């Protein structure tokens, strides 16, 4: 079986079909496992380590058995499973839905955005909604696409699933409030480590993507270097900063960070440009990943 074939088929499946049904989605199962396990474990850093191992093991170890299957069964199962932990279509569709609603009903746009971001969306303006939609799109192309592919290259299907387990844990318990600060410490630090390289590769690839699209590639590179470390997360700023520069916009989470230079305003066209930029960046990343796997078997 060719890992390149698995990757390309998985990407095609995700683009054509999108997310698996809720009841069959492995990331949903991961979330359910986290909820169940954390009710058993105490709230300590040791509990966070145990939680990570306890959730990761059943989602990764059985995947090694797939290697013993013969083609084409191996190829089909591996491609379906990999497609389930990448989310290109969902990211793009979600951003476009927010933009579409913003044209007609700002309350509906706020509601749809609230399902994508943690910030309070009830009083956001048009520009703030557009900024938040661009931020979540460009940040999550790492979490939901390039990082799983990166660990698929390194460790095969178990690597991609291990990453999504850690990312899911971080999303659920990786917070600084009293309830999660201790149990979420290990998953949050591990998520930072696992995202370190993929986030930087993805941010850098946005620069040639901007060039190919006729966007501000020089600004993309400049803002990437200047603003990438302004976010609380050590990783999320790389793609957001590169996008802000490419789009010649300023992205802001009030009271938390400001990325990019002041601009005349954010509108729906900028959100559409962000979708184009993110999509081409993912194409470049996928092609680069396939090339690496062909050169280094």
Swiss-Prot record:
GO CC aspect terms: plasma membrane
Pathway it works in: Cofactor biosynthesis; adenosylcobalamin biosynthesis
Subcellular location: Cell membrane
A Pfam family recorded for this sequence: CobD_Cbib
Domain of life: Archaea
Transmembrane segments: 46-66, 72-92, 141-161, 193-213, 277-297
GO biological process: cobalamin biosynthetic process
S-S bridge residues: none
InterPro entries: Cobalamin_biosynth_CobD/CbiB
Keywords attached to this entry: Cell membrane, Cobalamin biosynthesis, Membrane, Transmembrane, Transmembrane helix
MF (Gene Ontology): ABC-type vitamin B12 transporter activity; threonine-phosphate decarboxylase activity
PANTHER family: COBALAMIN BIOSYNTHESIS PROTEIN CBIB (PTHR34308:SF1)
Function: Converts cobyric acid to cobinamide by the addition of aminopropanol on the F carboxylic group.
Protein family per UniProt: Belongs to the CobD/CbiB family.
Protein name per its UniProtKB record: Probable cobalamin biosynthesis protein CobD
Lineage, top ranks: Archaea, Methanobacteriati, Methanobacteriota, Methanomada group, Methanobacteria
GN (gene name): cobD
